[in-house]
């Protein structure tokens, strides 16, 4: 009898073991789900606190789904099984206030636009000074380098040209400087085709002094070139000036101006005196600002005269703790030229100068 009781009690033992194993497995699963849920909530709380979407990197798929429902996830890249989606628009950020310098402000602030104003000439006339001075104005954004679009790079197209420009706000003017435009035959037509409303700035200087400065710059790069006198004349005894030499031809301003007046009225061309830019920079820049239709922000308080260089420099500003002068090449000592050569060139330029004065309605007093 005892044998039977013991024999019947034996079979239920495997069922108890299975029940215990099932209960243990269920307990582990519940623990794992609770752990995953707590991790998800912790990451979600941090994401909300930091104000940016977070992606759960753990193994819990449930946690990932909960995060995706709560906030958009922005991982570094889509997984192979997911198509890429357009990113959500960023929250609006208050625009920082632009200071007077063109070098300040967010690089992505504003829009890249084609220039509304160009400094088109002339070489060695003072164009770099005008560019650096006008860049102080908060309503002007200028390209620092010379793009040479309308003379050398026109084939690249206007989209390429626009891509070079600094970003500007609606209230700002985009400007660039390339002095060789003034003597480029195709430049007026090309600029007109871009915009017939483009404002043009031409910095002019005594053509004899300009030619000597041009030669001095070339000599510093090519010390083996002929003398200034040798390049200026075909026959000095007869006084035959070589107008094929670029340094001489650039100074025949009225001839180049005729090409521009075929496309632009004189009211759209402003002439800056290179001489007055040295003696009265605030006055000349005041007229430039009037021409561009912006307030007179640049005044006497922005300049001081550098006796070593012999021309005005910018005082320190809010964006620059140090005064700004033009580069070392500016203000270099000119080569000594025979006074008789200078007199001959003055006589050569005289009729061109007079015609230029009459055309633009200004007497630059170069005689």
Swiss-Prot record:
Family of this protein: Belongs to the sulfotransferase 1 family.
Phylogenetic classification of the source organism: Eukaryota, Metazoa, Chordata, Craniata, Vertebrata
Chain residue ranges for the region called Disordered: 61-110
One GO MF term: sulfotransferase activity
Entry keyword Repeat: no
UniProt topology in membrane: Single-pass type II membrane protein
Keyword flag Transmembrane: yes
Subcellular location: Golgi apparatus membrane
Annotated protein name in UniProt: Heparan sulfate glucosamine 3-O-sulfotransferase 2
PANTHER family with a match to the protein in the record: HEPARAN SULFATE GLUCOSAMINE 3-O-SULFOTRANSFERASE 2, HEPARAN SULFATE SULFOTRANSFERASE
Disulfide bond entries: 313-325
Regions of this protein lying in the Lumenal compartment: 40-367
TM helices/strands, residue ranges: 20-39
Enzyme Commission number, as recorded: 2.8.2.29
Pfam families: Sulfotransfer_1 (PF00685)
Coarse class of the protein's main subcellular location: Golgi
Sites where the protein binds 3'-phosphoadenylyl sulfate: 124-128, 205, 213, 330-334
Keyword list, A-Z: Disulfide bond, Glycoprotein, Golgi apparatus, Membrane, Signal-anchor, Transferase, Transmembrane, Transmembrane helix
Biased amino acid composition, Low complexity: 84-96
Domain of life per record: Eukaryota
Tissue: Highly expressed in the brain and weakly expressed in the heart, placenta, lung and skeletal muscle.
Recorded catalytic activity of this chain's protein: alpha-D-glucosaminyl-[heparan sulfate](n) + 3'-phosphoadenylyl sulfate = 3-sulfo-alpha-D-glucosaminyl-[heparan sulfate](n) + adenosine 3',5'-bisphosphate + H(+)
């Amino acid at each position: 009898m005892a044998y039977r009781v013991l024999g019947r009690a034996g079979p239920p033992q495997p069922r108890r073991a299975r029940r215990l194993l099932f209960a243990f497995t269920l307990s582990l699963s519940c623990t794992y789900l609770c752990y995953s849920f707590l991790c998800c909530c912790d990451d979600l709380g941090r994401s909300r606190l930091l104000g940016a979407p977070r992606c759960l990197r753990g193994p819990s798929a449930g946690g990932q789904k909960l995060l995706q429902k709560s906030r958009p996830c922005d991982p570094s890249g889509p997984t192979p099984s997911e198509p890429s989606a357009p990113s959500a628009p960023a929250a609006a950020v208050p625009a920082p206030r632009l200071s007077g310098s063109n070098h300040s402000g967010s690089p992505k602030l504003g829009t890249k636009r084609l220039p509304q104003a160009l400094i088109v000439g002339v070489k060695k006339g003072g164009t770099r000074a005008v560019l650096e001075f006008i860049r102080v104005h908060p309503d002007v954004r200028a390209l620092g380098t010379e793009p040479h679009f309308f003379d050398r790079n026109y084939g690249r197209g206007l989209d390429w040209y626009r891509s070079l420009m600094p970003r500007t706000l609606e209230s700002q003017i985009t400007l660039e400087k390339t002095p060789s435009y003034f003597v480029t035959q195709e430049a007026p037509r090309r600029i007109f085709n871009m915009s017939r409303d483009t404002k043009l700035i031409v910095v002019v200087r005594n053509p004899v002094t300009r030619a000597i400065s041009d030669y001095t710059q070339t000599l510093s790069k090519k010390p083996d070139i002929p003398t200034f006198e040798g390049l200026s004349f075909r026959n000095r005894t007869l006084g035959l000036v070589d107008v094929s030499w670029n340094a001489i031809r650039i100074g025949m301003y009225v001839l180049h101006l005729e090409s521009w007046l075929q496309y632009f009225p004189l009211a759209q061309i402003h002439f800056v005196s290179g001489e007055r830019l040295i003696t009265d920079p605030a006055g000349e820049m005041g007229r430039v600002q009037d021409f561009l239709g912006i307030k007179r922000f640049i005044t006497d308080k922005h300049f001081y005269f550098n006796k070593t260089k012999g021309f005005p420099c910018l005082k320190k500003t809010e964006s620059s703790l140090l005064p700004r002068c033009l580069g070392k090449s500016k203000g270099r000592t000119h080569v000594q030229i025979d006074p008789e050569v200078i007199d001959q060139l003055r006589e050569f330029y005289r009729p061109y100068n007079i015609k230029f004065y009459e055309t633009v309605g200004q007497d630059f007093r170069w005689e």
